[in-house]
């Protein structure tokens, strides 16, 4: 029965992954992500049903567009596969069981899916464009408020802690508004701060702090490798110039998902040892 559940979760996950690839491409271009038909970005030909089956279409078409024969970027296959596996792992660490599936479990799993959607979209867009998309940030704030209301009303969580998170949201949004008025552009830093607050709401302090530490280490390693490779280049960039090209949101999101899965798995392991 568990295998059947994991197959279902994997299939749901790869369809979400297909949506993620579409959204990461379209959102920065401000294109519709729900009603506009999928099309090839090279020849603009509308894709048929057989072109839209996650993973399988990529394999059967040998990684090429059926209409213009242009190569399809492997990120589509990678993200769809990883998304499917992520859903399976989430179901496993949350101990989902078809025979004993409670309403609370369904709600908690749904909130995690909404959160994963936020993390993947904000991270993917940042990796492709080095930009913290404001629409995705707003989506993160909305699902955070929904989750906080759920925790406070249903699970009687500490309302003061979430009140602090709301206050932090307001402060950062005010700073972002000031930055927008003064410099006529959204601040990358405020986008990162909004992302961190959303991480705090869904994953707690421990996972968030761990994610930040891993991100800083990854950035330090990246800078070190760059220095070693480019040390003989007379026109090499400074650390400050390089840091402006690093997609911090991507590293932060990736490390957060890994940290969250690891903590949930360890929690289950401790309960199993003690039980």
Identify the residue ranges that each predicted region occupies:
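A membrane-topology feature that recognizes alpha-helical transmembrane segments
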Residues: 1-275
């Amino acid at each position: 029965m568990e295998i059947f559940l994991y197959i279902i979760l994997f299939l749901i996950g790869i369809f979400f992954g297909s949506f993620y690839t579409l959204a990461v491409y379209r959102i920065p271009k401000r294109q519709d992500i729900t009603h506009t038909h999928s099309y090839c970005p090279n020849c603009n030909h509308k894709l048929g049903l057989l072109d839209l089956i996650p993973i399988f279409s990529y394999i059967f078409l040998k990684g090429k567009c059926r209409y213009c024969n242009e190569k399809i970027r492997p990120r589509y296959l990678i993200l769809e596969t990883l998304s499917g596996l992520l859903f399976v792992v989430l179901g496993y660490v949350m101990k989902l069981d078809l025979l004993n599936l409670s309403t609370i479990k369904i709600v908690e799993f749904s909130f995690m899916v909404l959160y994963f959607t936020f993390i993947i979209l904000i991270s993917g867009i940042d990796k492709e464009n080095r930009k913290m998309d404001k629409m995705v940030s707003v989506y993160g704030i909305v699902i955070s408020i929904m989750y906080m209301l759920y925790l406070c009303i249903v699970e009687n969580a500490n309302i003061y802690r979430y009140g602090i998170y709301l206050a932090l949201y307001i402060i950062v949004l005010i700073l972002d508004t000031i930055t927008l008025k003064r410099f006529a552009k959204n601040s990358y830093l405020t986008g990162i701060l909004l992302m961190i607050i959303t991480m705090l709401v869904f994953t707690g302090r421990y996972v968030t702090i761990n994610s930040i530490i891993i991100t800083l280490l990854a950035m330090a390693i990246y800078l070190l490798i760059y220095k070693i490779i480019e040390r003989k280049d007379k026109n090499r960039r400074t650390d400050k110039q390089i840091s402006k090209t690093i997609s911090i949101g991507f590293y932060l999101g990736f490390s957060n998902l890994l940290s969250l899965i690891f903590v949930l798995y360890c929690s289950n392991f401790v309960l199993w040892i003690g039980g």
